[in-house]
Regions:
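Arginine/glycine-rich "motif VI" loop of SF2 helicases in the C-terminal RecA-like domain
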Residues: 53, 120-127, 153-154
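Active-site/ligand-binding-proximal alpha/beta "capping" segment
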Residues: 88-122, 130, 180-189
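Short beta->alpha connector loops at strand-helix junctions that form conserved
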Residues: 39, 63, 83-84, 103-105, ...
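A cross-family phosphate/adenosyl-ligand binding-site feature
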Residues: 1-96, 135-169, 173, 180-192
Length: 192
């Protein structure tokens, strides 16, 4: 199984986010999951990569050259790909994966996650999207997405695009049991 993980590059966040990331990384290694991530050495990206590498797991970093030039890259990650743009990076994140996991993060993580949700809504991405809601971090996003449906900005079927889980141990099971998504989802992307 190959999973893309979106997550924070901040080192100043509460330790509980690092602990949850470490647990998830160990679950990935235990289940022979190959992880694709943003390639960073700091914050949750660093914790994810370091834990996977320390436990002999598989991980690939993808980062734009301009970020690498300011030395944001995790030098411990051997499988590393540089891109020309942020857009190219996001395209590569979603290629040949079996699922997508979003850990808590800032505007970069949110932007990546919302783009994946949009692509799935349009049938351009069909894999499970699991959002790890550590400490209720994503509750406001969950409420906003639900409001999009209740206010009819999105179709009620779109509630099946994503899943929220509270614990790292729930992530892989949620990916395995997620309903398949219709590649013809564009037919109901517009709420007529």
């Amino acid at each position: 199984m190959r999973i893309c993980v979106y997550c924070s590059s901040s080192a100043k966040i509460d330790k509980s986010y690092f602990e949850a990331t470490e647990k998830l990384a160990k679950e990935f290694v235990k289940n022979n999951v190959w992880v694709v991530f943003g390639g960073g050495a700091i914050g949750l990206m660093g914790k994810l990569a370091d834990t996977i590498i320390e436990n002999k797991g598989k991980i690939k970093g993808i980062m734009p050259r301009f970020m690498n030039e300011v030395e944001w890259a995790n030098k411990k990650v051997e499988d590393f790909e540089l891109t020309d743009t942020m857009h190219e990076r996001k395209v590569k994140f979603l290629q040949d994966i079996d699922g997508l996991v979003a850990l808590p993060g800032g505007c970069g993580t949110m932007e990546e996650l919302l783009e994946a949700i949009t692509l799935k809504r349009l049938g351009q991405f069909t894999k499970p999207i699991v959002i790890l809601n550590t400490n209720g971090y994503y509750e406001p996003l969950k409420q906003m997405l639900e409001k999009c449906v209740t206010e009819k900005f999105m179709h009620k079927k779109h509630l099946e695009i994503w899943s929220f889980v509270k614990e790292p141990e729930e992530v892989l099971e949620k990916i395995r049991t997620s309903k398949s998504w219709d590649p013809n989802a564009i037919e109901f992307a517009v709420n007529k």
